[in-house]
Amino acid sequence: MGMRMMFTVFLLVVLTTTVVSSTSVRASDGRNAAADNRASDLIAQIVRRGCCSHPACNVNNPHICG
């Protein structure tokens, strides 16, 4: 194999790796964001339930217990 051919193969490998990497990152970002939102909602519900059942916390945090 000549130097020009090896360089061409190298460029193709780099280009392919870049394309595959960028598409997989974009796809996983959406899944991670959805999972983060569900986790945040679950944590907020647990905190509300725990705080609102204690009178002192309920009085100090009326914005949480509504």
Curated annotation (Swiss-Prot):
Changing residue 62 to A: No change in ability to inhibit rat alpha-3-beta-2 nAChRs. Small decrease in ability to inhibit rat alpha-3-beta-4 and alpha-7 nAChRs. Changing residue 63 to D/N/S/W/Y: Decrease in inhibiting potency towards human alpha-3-beta-4/CHRNA3-CHRNB4 nAChRs. Disulfide bonds join 51-57, 52-65. Keywords: Acetylcholine receptor inhibiting toxin, Amidation, Cleavage on pair of basic residues, Disulfide bond, Ion channel impairing toxin, Neurotoxin, Postsynaptic neurotoxin, Secreted, Signal, Toxin. GO terms for cellular component: extracellular region; host cell postsynaptic membrane. Expressed by the venom duct. This is Alpha-conotoxin RegIIA. It comes from Conus regius (Crown cone).
